[in-house]
Amino acid sequence: MECGKHTLVTHIAVLHHSSALLVKYSTGHDGQPGWFLPNDDLHHLEHPDQAAKRILKEHVGIEDATLKLVEIESFVGNNETWHLIFDYLAFPRTMKLSTGPTVSDAKWFEIDKLPSAEEFAHHGWGKSVLLKHALAKAQPAATM
């Protein structure tokens, strides 16, 4: 079901120890070339948690991962719709991948050896989201 006013997306930073998973989409995802974090629009009435599980399974073949919602972004996108982006961290049990039909490439990168921002879709937005959440994950929790 298309909506001309809202865009609801689940966006997943998949981390395994010091590596992050990036994908390239074969269908001109968002009309953008380059690396993405696995993501997709939510289906009608789909909960963001269920969307994250679906995306991991359908896009990269990951069925066993711990998921954590870390941020909800809100902004007006290039298509003038209100975007709500549900950013998740995913911690799969293994690094084994199986790409789905919309994914042309999936690759694990060491966090400190990620492609340049220019090699990411949307002017490096996925890289900035990934680094923000990956670095926050590595920081010890504040004590009270």
Language-model-detected regions and their locations in the chain:
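Conserved N-terminal beta-strand and adjoining loop/helix that marks the start
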Residues: 1-21, 41, 72
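Conserved Nudix-box catalytic region and its N-terminal flanking loop in Nudix hydrolases
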Residues: 16-58
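Active-site-adjacent beta-strand/loop module that shapes the phosphate/pyrophosphate-binding cleft
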Residues: 73-97
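Nudix hydrolase/Nudix homology domain
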Residues: 29-34, 101-144
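Hydrophobic pocket-lining residues within nucleotide cofactor-binding pockets
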Residues: 42, 73, 92-93, 111-114
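A short coil-to-beta-strand element that immediately follows conserved catalytic motifs
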Residues: 62-71
